[in-house]
Amino acid sequence: MNRLKEKYLKEVTPALMSKFNYKSIMQVPKIEKIVINMGVGDAVQNPKALDSAVEELTLIAGQKPVVTRAKKSIAGFRLRAGMPIGAKVTLRGERMYDFLDKLISVSLPRVRDFRGVSKKSFDGRGNYTLGIKEQLIFPEIDYDKVNKVRGMDIVIVTTAKTDEEARELLTLLGMPFQK
């Protein structure tokens, strides 16, 4: 069993039960899924850029991403509906915990001038969004093979009803929030 999942079951669940006075163990918030999204704006002019983004996302997440396409045509961006403009991957279960563990313990500390992640990035429904400026913080990415520094969005979807519950859940799991 994954290290983070074990921690969730043994330490986090009892702590949340006592703090928020839940009646049943099923009320305790848990992480439902993690969605990693990489928008590749230059895929319009350079379709090869998307291939490398998909490859990198596969390495980071450990599963094949879905290519996202434009919903509408936007003339200003020379964009037609249906053109591929990004990639996203949804992690659940074992892989989700593996990724979160890796993110918290290895990748985030490698960010330059890292002082913790923002406390304000909750959406009011108990989900947390985190933007990453460069894919090089992940240990699987080889610095020499990167042709362009790309960022990504990581959305952590929890079953928490409020931001406060979600923040407590992530803090107990070891998410380094700013002081």
From Swiss-Prot:
Keywords: Ribonucleoprotein, Ribosomal protein, RNA-binding, rRNA-binding, tRNA-binding. It comes from the Bacteria. The keyword Secreted does not apply. Disulfide bonds: none annotated. InterPro entries: Ribosomal_uL5, Ribosomal_uL5_bac-type, Ribosomal_uL5_C, Ribosomal_uL5_CS, Ribosomal_uL5_dom_sf, Ribosomal_uL5_N. Pfam families: Ribosomal_L5 (PF00281), Ribosomal_L5_C (PF00673). Signal peptide: none annotated. Belongs to the universal ribosomal protein uL5 family. Part of the 50S ribosomal subunit; part of the 5S rRNA/L5/L18/L25 subcomplex. Contacts the 5S rRNA and the P site tRNA. Forms a bridge to the 30S subunit in the 70S ribosome. This is one of the proteins that bind and probably mediate the attachment of the 5S RNA into the large ribosomal subunit, where it forms part of the central protuberance. In the 70S ribosome it contacts protein S13 of the 30S subunit (bridge B1b), connecting the 2 subunits; this bridge is implicated in subunit movement. Contacts the P site tRNA; the 5S rRNA and some of its associated proteins might help stabilize positioning of ribosome-bound tRNAs. NCBIfam families: PRK00010.1. This is Large ribosomal subunit protein uL5. The gene is rplE.
